[in-house]
Amino acid sequence: MNQSQRKTLSGLVAQLDTIKDAINDMATEEQDKYDNLSEGLQQSDNGQKFEVNASTLNDAVSELESVINNLGEVE
């Protein structure tokens, strides 16, 4: 990989990291919404949606971390 390609890859990794951070913030917000509900409301459809959304977003963050780590191994 030449210098220009490494620079491009570095920029892409930085963009992915920014996206990962934004998704992580969204996951935290969804989890906070769920946590701030009473126990009864946590069991409601909306409460369950908050919990599922947080979990799905956290899964996406984990996948992006894996992609970022893999790209970091490219020489």
Go through the PLM ranges and name each one.
Residues 1-75:
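Long, low-complexity or tandemly repetitive, helically biased scaffold regions used
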